[in-house]
Amino acid sequence: MEEGKITTASLPGEGKAPRDAYAGYIRRKRLLLVVLFVAVVGIAVFSMTMGSLQIAPADVVRAVFGQGDVRTVAAVQNIRLPRVLTAIVAGVALALAGCAYQSVLRNPLASASTLGISQGAAFGASLAIIIFAGGAGASAAYEGISTADPVTTALFAFAGAMLSTVVILLLSRVREMTPESIVLLGVALSALFTAGTTIVQYFAEDSQVAAVVFWTFGDLGRVSRSQLAVMALVTVVSAVFFFANRWAMNAIESGEGLAHSLGISVNGVRLANMLVASAAASTVIAFCGIVNFVGLVAPHVMRRVLGADYRFLLPASALAGAGMLLVSDILCHVVVSPLILPISAITSFVGAPIFIYLLFRGVSR
């Protein structure tokens, strides 16, 4: 064989090396996803063992399927399982939304909180509570709080969150803003909505202000089964949409120039992803209240572990978000038991140190 005709494929075993390396790459990513899934299931079962009625893990599993002691089945299916499912669905939705924001804006700081979506929801909820106070939505844990009907509050919170998204998208289209400018615009809107919430509270009665503050605490236990079904539906639709756009997100991650050369409408993908991500995040915030750091930290951590391949980053972020919210919910119940701490405070206490560590680790590199 002539020297000029020798190729890698003609050498024994050489043609298989890249293929084997790629297969190993895929296996490692899939193995991590399996580990994350098993961890989430384990945390969920452990979470349902805790409470005033201590239940063994095996009994929890049987109770989920309606088997075992009547009291145990009632405690698991009526109280603990809905709360755990709410934590999983909310964690998945917020993490997927954060992953999508960080992808299309190419900014690791993009999340529902930094884009003003959480603050817009708080403003909408404040209006609902103060305008329609006196309904049947008072919490049993806070006697004397005057609040609006939960459905009305959720609708106003959703409207406020989507208002922030619409303003960002409209202004970014008018001025052709860069992804960095969009995040800065979100920070400005956060301050604006926070100021609006403060002014609304200033003119409210004490009981109404207490209701607004209680709503912003965040609470997974106040989500009804019908609200959980709505959250789950929105989350599933959003997940399908994001996964269908995984290759476009990979292309944008490699550079907008490359994405354009592949025939991808970067602005169109950015618009669609932001709308779907905002719908998912807004739905969760409307029903659960403010839940900080899940949409920021979970995708950021998984990006450090897995890289920016959205075929694996999306499901990994979803599982990490579910796990983070489950762990936070457990801490809510055990830190100062029998009191239950606000979920937003615990997610911040859990997420902020992790994020600071990742930032310092990145700087040291």
Model-predicted segments: where are they?
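Alpha-helical transmembrane segments in inner-membrane proteins
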Residues: 2-365
